[in-house]
Amino acid sequence: MLHKLLAIAQAEIGIREEGGNNRGTRIRQYQRATDLPPGPWPWCAAFVSFCVQQWLIENDVPEWLRLTRSPAQWQPRTALAYGFRQWAKDRTRTTSIYTDKDPAQPGDIVTFDFSHVGIVLEDAGDHLVTVEGNTNGKGERDSETGDGVWRKIRPKSLARNFIRIHPAR
């Protein structure tokens, strides 16, 4: 089922801000997936929240997760990269938190030490292949110069946590 989440995230690769400064029609859609009003704020977490929300629209996903509440109550709405950890802690039946020392799996949400978040495509040993919003196509560590949704390769040492979504236990 996580392949559908990966497909949603990967379909966004290439979306760019319009005029910089965290602006643009699609960027506003990402930001509306959070509890904050759209504005000139970093949107990496909004991108991940948006992707998970779109994934939940798929008819078979809530059933696969075995949700006991509505998808709208389960979905993330955080605009903070580190907010995903609390989101996962509040959903221990359907999420697990792993450290940066654990292997990542495709579909994991990865939080980075520099207050950034993305979706894991692959754990390549000492590097992660991810899809991230509010980043750039350069090899830079942070997202201060972010301008779009990109496929990134980052050192795994920059990861803080992996949040794995799974069927209810």
Model-assigned labels for residue ranges:
Residues 1-69:
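N-terminal capping segments
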Residues 14, 18-19, 105, 131-133, ...:
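Intrinsic disorder/low-complexity signature
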Residues 25-39, 111-154:
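Glycine-rich catalytic cores of cysteine/serine-nucleophile enzymes that process amide/ester linkages
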Residues 58-138:
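...with weaker cross-activation on analogous glycine-rich loops/strands in unrelated enzymes
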Residues 146-169:
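Low-complexity, Gly/Ser/Thr/Pro-rich intrinsically disordered linker/tail segments
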